Regions:
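Aromatic-residue hotspot detector
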Residues: 92, 131-133, 159-160
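HotDog/MaoC-like acyl-thioester-processing domains
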Residues: 1-81, 136-165
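A conserved acidic, glycine/proline-rich C-terminal tail/linker
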Residues: 123-141
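Active-site helix/loop of acyl-thioester processing domains in fatty-acid/polyketide metabolism
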Residues: 1-30, 96-127
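A contiguous, surface-exposed recognition patch within enzymatic or periplasmic domains that forms
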Residues: 75-108
Length: 165
């Protein structure tokens, strides 16, 4: 999974600066994963970027960041899960060679890749899909609420919804 994340980061275009991830899809697939990654992207306002390596596949959607808080404050947030520190966010971003400055700013946005890595750590799954509803900032406590095979991650508002299968 990390190799596909790095491949997507290497595909970076300057005009994508400041955009936020709206969706991440990952599939381990079966069979051989050797060989180079194939990268493709399309779109102008909403950017779809795909990386394929052997049977593994990752796709993300990038959207312009509006800066607006969307959604109501959540009363039942679930159980505390994680609080990403500024240093943790910046280090993860640098290790992936993620060029988006929003992960290095004075109040860094937690990378969707970092959320995916933390959610899947130590878990056995074949597919992952995360919809990002609101940026999560370093220093904000994240609470998880599970409903079936879905995890809802919230700070004050719903930040992401993840499904692992």
């Amino acid at each position: 999974m990390e190799e596909l994340m790095k491949a997507l980061c290497r595909a970076w275009e300057d005009e994508w600066q400041g955009m936020v991830m709206g969706e991440l899809r990952y599939s381990k697939g079966e069979g051989e994963t050797n060989g180079p990654c194939e990268i493709s992207w399309s779109g102008r306002k909403i950017i779809r970027i795909r990386a394929v390596k052997g049977a593994g596949r990752m796709e993300i959607l990038l959207f312009p960041f509006s800066g607006k808080t969307v959604g109501k404050k959540r009363e039942d947030k679930g159980t505390w899960w994680h609080t990403f520190s500024e240093e943790e966010v910046r280090s993860f971003s640098l290790a992936l060679e993620d060029h988006n400055e929003i992960h290095q700013s004075h109040r860094p946005v937690v990378s969707g890749f970092q959320i995916a890595s933390a959610l899947t750590k130590g878990k056995n799954f074949e597919r992952l899909r995360i919809h990002f509803h609101h940026p999560l900032y370093a220093g904000d406590a994240v609470y998880l609420k599970q409903a079936g095979n879905r995890d809802y991650g919230s700070s004050d508002v719903l930040c992401f919804e993840a499904v692992m299968e």
